[in-house]
Amino acid sequence: MSQRSTKMGDTIAAIATASGAAGIGIIRLSGSLIKTIATGLGMTTLRPRYAHYTRFLDVQDEVIDDGLALWFPAPHSFTGEDVLELQGHGSPLLLRQLLTRCLDLGARQAHPGEFSERAFLNGKLDLIQAEAIADMIGAADLRAARAARRSLDGVFSRRCEALAQQLIRLRIHVEATIDFAEESLDTLDRAQIRTSLQTLNVELTQLLRDAEHGKRLCDGLYTVLVGPPNVGKSSLLNALIGSDRAIVTDVPGTTRDTLRESVHFHGLEFVLVDTAGLREEGDAIEREGMRRTLNELQRADLALVVLDACDPQIGSLALADALTSVPRVLWIHNKLDLLTEPPSALDTDVIPVSAMTGAGLETLKTRLRTLLLGETVETIEGEFSARLRHVQALQRTAAHVTDANAQFAYEHLELTAEELRLAYKALGEINGSMSPDELLGRIFSNFCIGK
């Protein structure tokens, strides 16, 4: 159990609504002292799952506030413990006073995410669902919110569990044959195991693609604008976000540092990164800017390579090399307005635009939307939210399944079984069944205090 959770017997309390004045404010409590605290606040009777109008009293029986109290007895609550919600006026002063009174009556201030952590530890949620709560709260658009809702409803969890069961059955089959190691595998057994490994690999590959898609929905597509100096990268960024955020001049090398802006196209989030132009020479400051550009490319989901439509030369060997590791590359020929003749037929991965006039920008936005959504999830109904750690765990799982396939080809049954065990362990990190305590601590510490 994590260090954060060694006091599971404590009763915790926190303000669950956003800071600032509002019409309603909520304090949430969870733990074994709920009835004692309710009595201390002046509530003599509470019926489960009923809204009780009451006055919340201080130690001198003075009224702190009035509002509604709702009691959810264990185990039928969000955390699996006794839960009490106090709904009063959204005055920060009154909420702090009411929270202090709850703490004086025996509760302690909850850590960030501790309510969700208790729900996880008490088996009310798996780790995917707990993270989906935070993803739903932080969603930047409706589609991402709906994807997080599906993860909270268990769409992602059920697919992981189905794969976990396949791994268990397959490992049992392989280990059963080890008991008869003196006999070679018969044709039927060999075919069954090989088919099961192939089926597992196909389904795992599809789940990995869908998880990558879910991560893009939640995080947005990290899109880095790169290219030679003075081709209009900053102008293009300004045109796409509809604001003069980046400095634009005719002097090559004006952009020395990276600039990040979140923007939504067709209801989907993109993180656009303007970078220093890349060329073979430059002063010390410009070279530092170019180094940062190459670093940004290492984390890019997509590179927009911006070139001058009048002279579309990349002009940098370092950029050409760096692009080989970027998952997606889209070529932009900017300054279309300066061409004296219409552009000749271009490759489908090249989009002619003019940051100055806006020509081609809608085509670019549509292409960006297509790149974010991809074709990995057949319907919107199948989308779910995912995080980087989920994708990485699935990648490790897939690598172990691939190794199991290779070991089985040589009839190394013990090694095949071991790779399947490691695959199951990696997959279990996703829903928390195999997650180390320090990972759980990091995940829940990033939640809101009242969640």
Swiss-Prot record:
Matches recorded under InterPro entries: G_TrmE, GTP-bd, GTP-bd_TrmE_N, GTPase_MnmE, MnmE_dom2, MnmE_helical, P-loop_NTPase, Small_GTP-bd
Chief place of localization: cytoplasm
TrmE-type G domain residues: 220-373
Localization per Swiss-Prot or TrEMBL: Cytoplasm
Catalytic EC class: hydrolase
Binding locations of GTP: 230-235, 249-255, 274-277
Residues reported in the UniProt entry to bind K(+): 230, 249, 251, 254
UniProt record, GO biological process: tRNA methylation; tRNA wobble uridine modification
Residues that coordinate or bind Mg(2+): 234, 255
UniProt-annotated binding residues for (6S)-5-formyl-5,6,7,8-tetrahydrofolate: 28, 85, 124, 451
Keyword field: Cytoplasm, GTP-binding, Hydrolase, Magnesium, Metal-binding, Nucleotide-binding, Potassium, tRNA processing
GO molecular function, one term: metal ion binding
Listed cofactors: K(+)
EC number: 3.6.-.-
Cofactor note: Binds 1 potassium ion per subunit.
Source domain of life: Bacteria
Function: Exhibits a very high intrinsic GTPase hydrolysis rate. Involved in the addition of a carboxymethylaminomethyl (cmnm) group at the wobble position (U34) of certain tRNAs, forming tRNA-cmnm(5)s(2)U34.
Subunit structure, as described in the record: Homodimer. Heterotetramer of two MnmE and two MnmG subunits.
Family: Belongs to the TRAFAC class TrmE-Era-EngA-EngB-Septin-like GTPase superfamily. TrmE GTPase family.
Protein name: tRNA modification GTPase MnmE
Gene symbol of the encoding locus: mnmE
